[in-house]
Every structure is written in C-alpha cells, then in structure tokens.
C-alpha cells in the first residue's frame, strides 16, 4: 500500500500527490495514476497494479493503501507543497522479498541518496531537504538496485542538521575533517561526503580502489556509504576545468578518462549516472552542474572543504568551485550555510609535524603548528577556528587513515606517504569560517 502517514494535523501545509511512471509499453499511454491526499482517496490505473480495477481508500489514517512494486525501469513520484523549507525525516515502510537492496531517492528531480532496504519487511528512515513551495519526491530503480515494494511513508519535520564534506581526493575528508565528522555523527546529525575526483593520477585502475578505501574509512567514523557522492572526475584536472574560457570543452585526465565513473562493485556509481542516467564529461559545465545540484538538493547546514591557500591545484580550485556554488545559491535562492575551509597541503613540505610515539608505541597527541604564510590569499592565522579532539577521536582518525592502503604504502607506479597522512592525527582541527 502507498500511504501518507500524516496521523495528526501538524502538517496541514503539506499536500501530497503521487504518480507512477513506468516504461511506455507497460502503461500504453494511460493517464498516470493519481494519489490525491486532499480528497482522501488513492486511485491507481491498471498499469500500476496490473488490474482493471481502481483501488480506493477513503480512510488514509487507518493504515490502508496500495502496494507499489518498484522494479527495473520504474519510478514512483510524489508532489509536495510546503510553507517552509526544512530538513524532513521520511519514514518508508516496505517489503523486500530478495536480498538486502537499495532504491534511488530523488528530491525535485535530482538524486539524493540510495536508500537501503534490508531483506524482509520493515521501515527505514532518511533525512531529506524540501524547499518552500511545490516540489517532487521520487523513488527510482537505479543501476545496482533491487525490486522493492513500497507500502507506506510519512514525513516529519526533522531536528537533524546536515554537514557536507567536499573532498578533492579520497582521504582528504579524513585528514582534514575526521574530528568534525565524528562530533557530528555523535550528536545524532548527518554527514554527507562529496568526492570531486577519483584520485587516479598514477594509475587508471586506482579510482575504484580509492573509493572503496574511503568507504571503509568513513565507516570507521560512522558514515554509511549511502551518504557518499562520487562525482568521479579526473585527478589533477579541476584547475583546467575551472579556468577554461569555454565550460563545454572536454579534457582528458592524466588517467586517460574523459568521463565520470565510480565503483559499481560497491554500488557506488558516479553521481551524474545516478542523477541523469549517463556519465558526465570532463568539462566545467558538467562539473559545476553536478556540484551545484548536490549542494542545492542536500542544502547542508555546514560545508567543509579544502583551502584556496594550498599548493595542490585540485584543493585550491576545488575550494573556489565550492565557494562559487554557495555564493550563487545564496544570491539566487536565498540558501544560507556556513563554509569551513581547512588546509591539507601547506606551502612548507615539513608541515604538518610528523607523528611521534612513546617507548610503548602509543602516539603522542599534540596540536597543529601554524603551517605557513597564507600564500597571499588573505588567510589570517589569528582568526582561525579550532576544535579539540578527544583521545578516542584521535585514535579513530588514526584507524580511519589505516584504511588507505594505497596512499600509505604506495603501488606499482607511486610511493606511499604514510608519514604525511598520520601526521594529521593531532589534538585539533582548524578552519576559516564564512557565513552565508
């Protein structure tokens, strides 16, 4: 059954309708079924329930409805009209007769997450962001998904906050932000992680390996892989994309790729494939569009990313791209957030101070030293914001860094850099903070 479970009158401002879109051969041009909550009825055409009979339910609060199977190629959509933009908790009751599976959840036409449905029947919950006015929530069967029957759902305004970490490469989210990630998760809030590139400069087969390493590292910190967005662009090309006078020009990355990809073996497809049905090209038009759609759809309360003051071009221009998107959404759509910028690759190669251990092999936990002059980009070390990590949080950060085998130990075409990576196991993390 498909039921909107608004069991009290708190959400009178929310009006929902729903329509199922199946392949044309299945519906034979029929009008899409309408779920009219205002009228207190649910109606479904035969292309939905494979029957010529319409199913009606005049008592939605009684827990009745229409079962809707979401199979390959299908989509279930619900329109909404709300008076105030906010994060909402969507609870979804389902029946999954197969193995553990997923379905794509879309908000206003853009991919939000893959919802996990364990084998059997039950209820799962996701936190989404709905904008003021009219919009649409959809469940779509995506690559890697399973056949799931949706039974009912309900929406409640959420008290959770959403933080987003935008990382140029797989490991930057841990080196710079593992402490903030842990504190956010411990507070019961949500962390989304956006991976701009696949970190595949040294080896064209390295991308999926690094994606899996990040997945394991984030799992150590309590972040589920469903909260990872793999943009899947080429390593060391963000500057070229950002500075190109023609945003439509397609670049070949050093890896040899010219279009986005993810790791299908982990059910982590690239964002553009999930969102639009095909990979994006390595051009700034697609890169900017993907980044804009992710941030605009999620509307995180806080965004963490790397610094314009770094020597690494992906970090420097990744920051510029994130800042540009936030400024545009703030100006054009009234989006408000806090942007936190931190440093991974300082100008001085001796920074950060390497990790030291005592005679028993236990790490000595010390604070970061100021890494370098800010490269003429106006970063004042007297105005930096610091957070303090507990011993347990530092040890978890160390364990998360352990997961990056390629970056710590190297590969056939490159050396590892474990000394640099573990040097980020410090008592503090630091940011320059901008409020929009």
Task: Set out the residue ranges of the language-model regions.
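A conserved mid-domain beta-alpha-beta active-site/ligand-binding segment of alpha/beta enzyme cores
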Residues: 352-407
């Amino acid at each position: 059954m498909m039921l909107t479970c608004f069991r009290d009158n708190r959400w009178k401002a929310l009006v929902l309708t729903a329509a199922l879109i199946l392949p044309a051969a299945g519906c034979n041009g029929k009008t899409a079924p309408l779920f009219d909550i205002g009228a207190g009825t649910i109606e479904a055409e035969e292309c939905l329930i494979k029957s010529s009979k319409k199913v009606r339910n005049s008592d939605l609060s009684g827990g009745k409805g229409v079962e809707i199977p979401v199979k390959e190629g299908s989509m279930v959509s619900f329109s909404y009209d709300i008076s105030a933009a906010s994060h909402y908790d969507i609870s979804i009751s389902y029946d999954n007769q197969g193995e553990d599976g997923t379905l794509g959840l879309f908000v206003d036409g853009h991919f939000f997450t893959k919802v996990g449905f364990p084998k059997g029947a039950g209820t799962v919950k996701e936190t989404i962001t709905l904008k003021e006015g009219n919009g649409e929530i959809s469940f779509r069967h995506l690559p890697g998904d399973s056949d799931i029957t949706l039974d009912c759902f309900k929406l409640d305004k959420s008290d959770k906050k959403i933080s987003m970490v935008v990382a140029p490469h797989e490991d930057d989210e841990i080196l710079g932000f593992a402490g903030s990630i842990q504190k956010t998760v411990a507070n019961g809030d949500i962390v989304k992680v956006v991976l701009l590139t696949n970190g595949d400069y040294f080896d064209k087969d390295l991308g999926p390996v690094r994606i899996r390493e990040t997945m394991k590292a984030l799992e150590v910190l309590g972040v589920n892989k469903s909260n990872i967005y793999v943009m899947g662009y080429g390593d060391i090309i963000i500057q070229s994309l950002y500075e190109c006078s023609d945003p439509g020009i397609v670049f070949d990355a050093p890896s040899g790729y010219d279009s986005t990809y993810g790791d299908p073996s982990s059910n982590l497809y690239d964002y553009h494939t999930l969102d639009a049905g095909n990979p994006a090209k390595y051009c700034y038009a697609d890169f900017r569009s993907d980044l804009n759609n992710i941030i605009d759809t999620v509307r995180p309360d806080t965004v963490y990313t790397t610094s314009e003051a770094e020597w690494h071009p992906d970090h420097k221009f990744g920051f510029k791209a994130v800042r540009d998107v936030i400024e545009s959404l703030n100006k054009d759509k009234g989006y408000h957030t806090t942007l936190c910028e931190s440093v991974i690759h300082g100008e001085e190669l001796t920074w950060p101070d390497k990790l030291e251990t005592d005679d028993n092999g236990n790490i000595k936990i010390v604070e970061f030293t100021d890494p370098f002059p800010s490269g003429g980009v106006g970063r004042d070390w007297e105005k930096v914001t610091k957070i303090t990590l507990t011993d347990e949080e530092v040890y978890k950060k160390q364990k998360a860094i352990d997961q990056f085998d390629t970056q710590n130990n190297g590969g056939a075409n490159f050396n590892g850099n474990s000394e640099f990576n573990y040097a980020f196991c410090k008592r503090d993390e630091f940011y320059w903070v901008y409020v929009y």
